[in-house]
């Protein structure tokens, strides 16, 4: 919070105050020292002029009586998206060494009247014009429905922290195709943008530290481990986690269904991201890529994104009937936005889709599986949001096979039917920043599951993420915020937020920027059923850190079958140029496979070398999978007992778990095929439990 300079009544202090005022006028921002002996949360040298924080009281520190940290989690934010998309999609900066007036200014093409703001027009943020002036008047932006203007000015992030937020996931984000369609001042290469956004996040940490007396002293702390995050939160500061949400990670786009990256590119890319401090990421976003298919957007947005997919990859989305209760978003038949439709080649139009075909045909590719395994090896957390249900289901199968807890859903883009599988693994979930009523309603849908698994809850603001935010409810609404109000812990008083000449009120302005998150949480509390939701949100930080710590501590189970002798009832032999030996199921290479002859009663078995304890068998099926099969064990290779069976096999990854038993031989016994082919397995893994 900005505080006036004061050091007694002497003429020297008055002269210094006059000098600082003149410096602010003539040279822009000048630091304003805090009073001697000020509280740790007050900056010792804040720029002036600057935004106010409008929160008084000490940020809570330490832990609760059970030794757990408290605080909210913003599981999905984009602090630096103004640096992505070619640098001109999101106008205004999170910070500037030249001060607030330089940070909170519009893009050059928006002047003088907003008529050149192409992206703002496309997304409905204005009626063809807007006042481009940010600081100090902010007549038209930021606003809850303006998708092209900065919402994450550092002081607004500071206000969210002062209101009780203790974890912020900063997803580094961009999209090369969108960049190519908009005004830009830099490269559209996605990895170049990701590197820049990471660097700018570290520069923001340095910028905040400079206000507090030097390195490590500010409230904005980038963390790379769960233990670091816990220490930061116990100090009462904000733990900032780096994530990645981009359409072509490591250059892994697909063109006409041909991957444009290799396993080597993935290894190099994951190593680089980990070195930058990234600990969570999406494998695909908006466009189908070489790693996975996406969950569709709906309505007009869906049509526009589908056109973007075609322009980027040469393919439109392809749909099929869903295999289970989970489904992707319906694409719909909305008219294509003219500005996008005119980009299509002559004679090409957006295809129509059957109303009962709601699932993306594309799932998790072999390269996607390789990338996911690479994330597991590096202790990184996977974001399921934006994955098609086919891809998400396959990813969950793989994570369950590894008993890997590092799985997240950060902003309501995962089918809710996956929630229990996520919690069973030990993952963390958050909902998008809907209206207070919408957020409470969505939270209620899985409240019993959170109670069952003893987990907290989070929100994903998606600020600067082109999503739209809660609008005004009016001062007379039943859940209208009464200013000033107290933070959830009772330790701070929060008043209307003031930046320059503009005062924001959530009731009349909606959630225009990140600084209004505490106000939105207060509105949730005032909504019917909202107090219990706020209570769950206050446990979000602990739950997020628990997921992260378990991810770091995960130890892969020993595959008892790796490299052991394998045999089979039959092997497909009639193609002399391809090897389908049963030994290929235990070679650790998902690019090779065993294939049987084309009949039902077939088996594959592995000799573990000696009697071992066995409690889990994982199968990676090729398209020729078993509808019905059983897992059998034996000590001598002649006398077998069935320990697990199914008659509803659906291919992909299968994990059979059963009470741990002694066995030397493990057999997969096919009873009924799901296809006209035989049975085919890429890999078989056997574990103790």
Kindly give the residue locations of the regions a language model identified:
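Short beta-strand elements bearing conserved aromatic residues within extracellular beta-rich modules
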Residues: 629-631
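Short beta-strand-plus-loop segments that form exposed binding edges in beta-rich domains
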Residues: 669-676
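Extracellular carbohydrate recognition and processing domains
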Residues: 641-659
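Secretory targeting and sorting signals
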Residues: 2-35
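N-terminal hydrophobic targeting/anchoring segments and the immediately downstream early-domain regions
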Residues: 35-361, 366-373, 392-400, 407, ...
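Disordered, acidic Ser/Thr/Pro-rich linker "stalks" and the adjacent N-terminal cap
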Residues: 26, 557-609, 620-625, 645-648, ...
């Amino acid at each position: 919070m900005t505080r006036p300079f004061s050091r007694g009544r002497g003429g020297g202090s008055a002269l210094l105050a006059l000098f600082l005022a003149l410096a602010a006028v003539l040279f822009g921002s000048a630091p304003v020292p805090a009073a001697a002996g000020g509280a740790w949360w007050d900056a010792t040298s804040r720029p002036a002029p600057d935004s106010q924080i409008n929160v008084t009281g000490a940020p809570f520190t330490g832990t609760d009586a059970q030794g757990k940290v408290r605080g909210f989690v913003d599981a999905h934010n984009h602090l630096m998206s103004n640096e992505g998309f070619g640098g001109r999609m999101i106008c205004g900066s999170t910070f500037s060494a030249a001060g607030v007036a330089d940070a909170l200014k519009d893009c050059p093409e928006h002047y003088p009247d907003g008529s050149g703001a192409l992206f703002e027009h496309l997304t409905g943020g204005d009626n063809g014009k807007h006042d481009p002036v940010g600081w100090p008047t902010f007549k038209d932006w930021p606003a809850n429905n303006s998708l092209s203007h900065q919402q994450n000015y550092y002081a607004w992030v500071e206000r969210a922290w002062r209101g009780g937020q203790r974890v912020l996931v900063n997803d580094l984000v961009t999209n090369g195709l969108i960049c190519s369609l908009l005004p830009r001042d830099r490269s559209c290469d996605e990895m170049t943008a990701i590197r820049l956004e990471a660097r700018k996040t570290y520069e923001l940490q340095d910028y905040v530290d400079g206000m507090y007396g030097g390195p490590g002293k500010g409230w904005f702390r980038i963390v790379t481990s769960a233990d670091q995050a816990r220490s930061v939160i116990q100090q009462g500061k904000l733990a900032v986690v780096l994530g990645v949400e981009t359409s072509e990670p490591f250059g892994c786009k697909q063109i006409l269904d041909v991957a444009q990256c290799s396993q080597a590119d993935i290894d190099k890319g994951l190593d680089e991201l980990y070195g930058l401090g990234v600990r969570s990421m999406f494998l695909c976003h908006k466009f189908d890529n070489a790693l996975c298919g996406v969950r569709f957007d709906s309505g007009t947005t869906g049509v526009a994104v589908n056109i973007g997919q075609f322009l980027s990859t040469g393919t439109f989305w392809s749909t099929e009937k869903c295999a289970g209760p989970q489904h992707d978003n319906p694409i719909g038949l909305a008219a294509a936005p003219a500005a996008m439709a005119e980009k299509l080649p002559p004679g090409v139009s957006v295809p129509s889709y059957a109303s009962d075909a709601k699932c993306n045909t594309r799932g998790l590719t072999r390269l996607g599986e390789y990338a996911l395994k690479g994330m597991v090896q590096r202790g990184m957390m996977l974001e399921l949001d934006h994955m098609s249900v086919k891809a998400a289901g396959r990813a969950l199968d793989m994570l369950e096979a590894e008993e890997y807890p590092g799985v997240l859903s950060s902003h309501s883009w995962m089918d809710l039917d996956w929630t229990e599988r996520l919690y069973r693994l030990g993952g963390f979930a958050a909902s998008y920043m809907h209206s207070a009523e919408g957020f409470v309603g969505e939270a209620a849908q899985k409240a019993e599951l959170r109670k069952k698994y003893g987990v907290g809850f989070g929100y994903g603001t998606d600020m600067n993420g082109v999503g739209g935010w809660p609008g005004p409810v009016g001062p007379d609404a039943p859940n209208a915020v009464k200013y000033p109000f107290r933070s959830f812990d009772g330790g701070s008083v929060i008043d209307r937020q003031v930046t320059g000449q503009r005062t924001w009120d959530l009731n009349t302005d909606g959630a225009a920027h990140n600084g209004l998150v505490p106000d939105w949480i207060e509105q949730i509390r005032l909504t019917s059923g909202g107090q219990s939701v706020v209570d769950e949100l206050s446990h979000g930080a602990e739950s997020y850190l628990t997921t992260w710590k378990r991810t770091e501590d995960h130890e892969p189970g020993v595959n008892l079958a790796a490299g052991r002798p394998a045999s089979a009832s039959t092997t497909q032999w009639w193609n002399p140029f391809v090897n389908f030996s049963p030994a290929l199921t235990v070679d650790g290479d998902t690019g090779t496979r065993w294939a049987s002859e084309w009949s039902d009663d077939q088996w594959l078995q592995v000799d573990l070398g000696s009697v071992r304890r066995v409690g889990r068998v994982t199968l990676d099926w090729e398209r020729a999978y078993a509808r019905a099969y059983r897992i059998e064990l034996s000590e001598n290779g002649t006398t077998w007992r069935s320990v697990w069976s199914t008659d509803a096999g659906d291919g992909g990854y299968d994990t059979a778990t059963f009470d741990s038993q002694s066995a030397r031989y493990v057999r997969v016994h096919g009873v009924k095929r799901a296809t006209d082919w035989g049975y085919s397995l890429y890999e078989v893994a056997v574990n103790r439990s």
